[in-house]
Amino acid sequence: MALDKVVDSAVLDAGMKSVADAIRAKAGTTDLLAWPDGFKAAVEGIQTGGGGGSTSDVAMKDVNFYDYDGTLVASYTLAEAQALTTLPDGPTHDGLTFQGWNWSLEKIHALTHPMNVGAMYITDDGKTRIYIRLEEGRTSPMLGVCPNGTVTVDWGDGTTPDILTGTSTTTVKWTPNHAYAAPGEYVIKLTVNGKMGFYGNSSSSGGSAILRYSSASDNRNYVYRNSIEKIEIGSSVTRIADSAFYNCYSLSLITIPKGVTMITDNAFNGCYSITSITIPKGVTSIASNAFRSCYSLASITIANSVTSIADSAFQGCYSLTSITIPNGVTSIWSNAFYNCYSLTSITIPNGVTSIADSAFRSCYSLTSITIANSVTRIADSAFYNCYSLASITIPDGVTSIADSAFRFCYSVAFYDFSNHTSVPTLASTNAFNGISVDCQIRVPASLVDAWKAATNWSTYANYIVGV
């Protein structure tokens, strides 16, 4: 191949070194790169993200970095993650500014079990964008948000904006019904001067307030609410309050910036189409029913700022396969992961003291669970119907096991109590109901007799073996 001009060899060498240095930095190596095969191999080995929503070919390992749409951006073994000196670059998307990952490098290094990390974004112009698709005969929505200040509503069709004024991020203010000239796709843009929250109502008049036909009960509210397909939250939004996106069945994508500090009861309850969520830094609790019945939710990354997972927070998230519970979490409440059929493994972090009633009930695919020493009580039906659970180690800190805690866990080969120095209280003879005939309850050899004679444990005397 002919060259248009001759390049000075010194310039070429300097350029090649610069390229090689950049490749080495991206690849996380200091090795010399042979030309051309070494360059090619190093470039192909660099993990790149899901900018533009492209399909990822990154292989899943232990520490997984996800984009907001669920694309796997980068993945590392635990050893590789411990060796990281910087976090991977964030993906790029038109109209969005990457705010970083919802776990810091320090917090990732402190966690010693598999985990998921999520990308945080804010809109590049600070406006909140609501992407809608209106059907024929359904072109007159009203919009409701909670301004503490003013919110300018640009309907995305070139008409004069509406302005909402309020004094609270939990009190809904409504626009008049807006008349679109034709059905189709529109982007509503909200410009906030002050602060803004989203709110709704799970009662008979309820559901998300964000897009409806009427502020009162009306069957047409469902039609407009379900025209919302994507939301990109901008600056000045601090609260996603009760039922904010309740039963927004068609909502499939949302970006939540790190300025949001509250996600409260029923916030995303019934968002059947949503597939991925990143909980940003600053959020401290996941409230009751927050993601209940999000049937398609396969990926969720929870910031390390979260300390509590409330009642039924993820109940009925049938597609959820993995979740990282941050080290700071001290409470996992009743039904938190009830009917998470696809969940395969869970680590209960140190700091949690009780696994509440039905917390992991009917997690049919759950094969392994790690329980921290801080746990003192396993409550009623905590692991009821966990058919696939293969074995479980009960740490010495557990002093009480409640009724039906491990009922119908047919596949468990052994329960390991070998680290215990005393016999924990067993509240009921139903605790291990359905135990397989060849299952073992492994206890210290010195405690076998005491264990077999203890209240309710005597029912399982034939399963108790000393180790």
Task: Enumerate the language-model features and the residues they cover.
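Short, low-complexity N-terminal tether/leader segments at secretion or assembly junctions of large
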Residues: M1-D57, T71
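Extracellular interaction modules
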Residues: D31-A41, Q82, W103-I122, P183-Y186, ...
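Extracellular ectodomain segments of secreted/surface proteins
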Residues: G51-V58, I122-C146, N193-I233
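Conserved "repeat-terminator" motif of extracellular CCP/Sushi domains
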Residues: T55-D67, P91, K107-D125, A431
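Structural signature of tandem-repeat unit edges
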Residues: Y68, L72-A81, E106-H109, R129-R133, ...
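Surface-exposed interfaces of beta-sheet-rich extracellular modules
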Residues: A83-A110, K195-Y199
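Residue-level recognition of secondary-structure-to-loop junctions
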Residues: S168-A182, Y186
